[in-house]
């Protein structure tokens, strides 16, 4: 959505928001908003349980937690921005004009822009658009920050595991957040072109792939040396643990990268198709919500990849317990019958041997 602000001196200012408004009957908008809220509440539960399990069962280095936990937490801000958009769709926020239909991610067509003389009444919508941009670029730069931290852990294997200094994750967090906020503001105020807005994705994916290969090669080489009985280098327990942690994080990262790449590809294709009217605007609901509902594949991938997390996640997740209880009811009944039969046989056996013993007396 592009907003064009034309002041009295005829100077135009543009704002670029990643929000969508549809030309649909009001009753249908209410229904679609209710359905979206149901899915968001489910995602809220899933994300909260995942964060709880990650913090309760800490199997990675503290620095890694400091980096990637905020990446999960900013999803709550993303949903807050979406709720603001829903409030404008359902006209909970009164405006003196109609917002109209805006389903293009970006456009230079003046007819498809929202023309206003001031931003009065749009402050919340602009804030909601900013937090959505911030989430996208936080994930982009955050993944690069995690890759950098694992690369540093591979280089400083001699003492990284025993290092209690927090300057590495704090410095990486400050850098990634500075880049995320500055890029979000640049895109929001339309200071960056369409190509420049996509450039961080390209750079991050390229550098992330190089960091992935570097971490993989270095740590697999260390693992071969550790398992080699004729090795010349002595590895301490903490160093061996660090190598295993790097490889475990790499395995988890590989699965998450594939999930994220699929999401980026699907959403990008959807935005392209909608921008050039290749598909009906009705599909915009699905493309848009693919971003907001990302905890489903990402959290499930993270939780079910690591056995320690999987066990606690299954015990804590309300939905998982419901499904499990539904499937285990018949088994529970059968098990109870088997236990009862076993106890009866044991009692009869004890009675037989007691009577046999008494007959010998």
UniProtKB/Swiss-Prot annotation:
Membrane topology according to the record: Multi-pass membrane protein
Top-level taxon of origin: Eukaryota
Gene giving rise to this polypeptide: sre-32
One Gene Ontology term from the biological process aspect of the record: sensory perception of chemical stimulus
Presence of the UniProt keyword Transmembrane helix in the record: yes
This protein's UniProt keywords: Membrane, Transmembrane, Transmembrane helix
Protein's cellular compartments: Membrane
Keyword Lipid metabolism: no
Listed name of the protein: Serpentine receptor class epsilon-32
GO cellular component: membrane
Stretches that traverse the bilayer: 34-54, 66-86, 124-144, 168-188, 195-215, 256-276, 286-306
Family per similarity comment: Belongs to the nematode receptor-like protein sre family.
């Amino acid at each position: 959505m592009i907003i064009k602000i034309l002041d009295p001196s005829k100077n135009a200012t543009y704002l670029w928001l990643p929000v969508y408004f549809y030309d649909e009957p009001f009753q249908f908008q209410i229904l679609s908003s209710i359905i979206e809220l149901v899915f968001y509440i489910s995602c809220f539960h899933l994300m909260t349980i995942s964060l709880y399990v990650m913090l309760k069962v800490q199997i990675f280095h503290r620095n890694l937690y400091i980096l990637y936990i905020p990446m999960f937490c900013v999803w709550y801000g993303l949903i807050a921005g979406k709720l603001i958009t829903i409030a404008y769709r359902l006209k909970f926020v009164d405006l003196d004009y109609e917002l109209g239909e805006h389903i293009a991610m970006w456009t230079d067509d003046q007819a498809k822009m929202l023309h206003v003389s001031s931003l009065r009444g749009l402050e919340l919508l602009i804030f909601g658009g900013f937090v959505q941009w911030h989430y996208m670029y936080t994930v982009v730069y955050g993944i690069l920050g995690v890759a950098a931290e694992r690369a540093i852990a591979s280089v400083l294997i001699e003492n990284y595991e025993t290092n209690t200094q927090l300057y590495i994750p704090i410095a990486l967090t400050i850098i990634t957040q500075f880049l995320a906020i500055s890029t979000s503001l640049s895109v929001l105020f339309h200071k960056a072109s369409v190509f420049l807005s996509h450039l961080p994705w390209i750079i991050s994916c390229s550098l992330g792939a190089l960091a992935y290969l570097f971490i993989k090669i270095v740590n697999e080489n260390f693992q071969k040396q550790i398992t080699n009985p004729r090795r010349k280098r002595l590895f301490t327990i903490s160093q061996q643990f660090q190598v295993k942690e790097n490889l475990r994080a790499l395995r988890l990262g590989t699965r998450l990268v594939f999930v994220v790449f699929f999401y980026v590809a699907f959403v990008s294709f959807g935005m392209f198709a909608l921008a050039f009217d290749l598909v009906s605007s009705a599909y915009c609901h699905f493309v848009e919500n693919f971003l907001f509902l990302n905890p489903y594949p990402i959290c499930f991938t993270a939780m079910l990849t690591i056995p320690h997390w999987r066990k606690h996640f299954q015990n804590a997740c309300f939905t998982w317990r419901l499904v499990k209880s539904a499937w285990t009811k018949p088994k529970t009944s059968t098990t109870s019958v088997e236990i009862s039969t076993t106890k009866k046989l044991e009692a009869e056996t004890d009675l037989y041997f007691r009577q046999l013993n008494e007959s010998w007396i």
